[in-house]
């Protein structure tokens, strides 16, 4: 008779610690790409609907992931090192 394999992987952090770390990382990235008032309003919306619960944390993580994914998919014009990319002319004639 087959038996389920034993869990031999590395020990994971507790779920709530991992979740908070993910949320903090998403928040840091989100403030680089979206206006703070939008993010504040999103936080208020989540709080009004979920209160101070893990379900609310999971909801805001899901929404931030979706927003960032769409933002990057459409074409983010923010640089990860703080330098905005300049758009070149179509024929490249402005090169020196």
Swiss-Prot record:
The modification Phosphoserine is found at residues 79, 94, 96. It comes from Human immunodeficiency virus type 1 group M subtype K (isolate 97ZR-EQTB11) (HIV-1). GO terms for cellular component: host cell; host cell nucleus; host extracellular space; virion component. Belongs to the HIV-1 VPR protein family. Phosphorylated on several residues by host. These phosphorylations regulate VPR activity for the nuclear import of the HIV-1 pre-integration complex. The keyword Manganese does not apply. During virus replication, may deplete host UNG protein, and incude G2-M cell cycle arrest. Acts by targeting specific host proteins for degradation by the 26S proteasome, through association with the cellular CUL4A-DDB1 E3 ligase complex by direct interaction with host VPRPB/DCAF-1. Cell cycle arrest reportedly occurs within hours of infection and is not blocked by antiviral agents, suggesting that it is initiated by the VPR carried into the virion. Additionally, VPR induces apoptosis in a cell cycle dependent manner suggesting that these two effects are mechanistically linked. During virus entry, plays a role in the transport of the viral pre-integration (PIC) complex to the host nucleus. This function is crucial for viral infection of non-dividing macrophages. May act directly at the nuclear pore complex, by binding nucleoporins phenylalanine-glycine (FG)-repeat regions. Pfam families: VPR (PF00522). It is found in: Virion; Host nucleus; Host extracellular space. The lineage of its organism: Viruses, Riboviria, Pararnavirae, Artverviricota, Revtraviricetes. This is Protein Vpr. The keyword Transcription regulation applies. Homooligomer, may form homodimer. Interacts with p6-gag region of the Pr55 Gag precursor protein through a (Leu-X-X)4 motif near the C-terminus of the P6gag protein. Interacts with host UNG. May interact with host RAD23A/HHR23A. Interacts with host VPRBP/DCAF1, leading to hijack the CUL4A-RBX1-DDB1-DCAF1/VPRBP complex, mediating ubiquitination of host proteins such as TERT and ZGPAT and arrest of the cell cycle in G2 phase. It comes from the Viruses. HIV-1 lineages are divided in three main groups, M (for Major), O (for Outlier), and N (for New, or Non-M, Non-O). The vast majority of strains found worldwide belong to the group M. Group O seems to be endemic to and largely confined to Cameroon and neighboring countries in West Central Africa, where these viruses represent a small minority of HIV-1 strains. The group N is represented by a limited number of isolates from Cameroonian persons. The group M is further subdivided in 9 clades or subtypes (A to D, F to H, J and K). Keywords: Activator, AIDS, Apoptosis, Cell cycle, Host G2/M cell cycle arrest by virus, Host nucleus, Host-virus interaction, Ion channel, Ion transport, Modulation of host cell cycle by virus, Phosphoprotein, Transcription, Transcription regulation, Transport, Viral penetration into host nucleus, Virion, Virus entry into host cell. Its main location: virion. Residues 1-42 are annotated as: Homooligomerization. GO terms for biological process: DNA-templated transcription; monoatomic ion transmembrane transport; protein homooligomerization; regulation of DNA-templated transcription; symbiont entry into host cell; symbiont-mediated activation of host apoptosis; symbiont-mediated arrest of host cell cycle during G2/M transition; viral penetration into host nucleus.
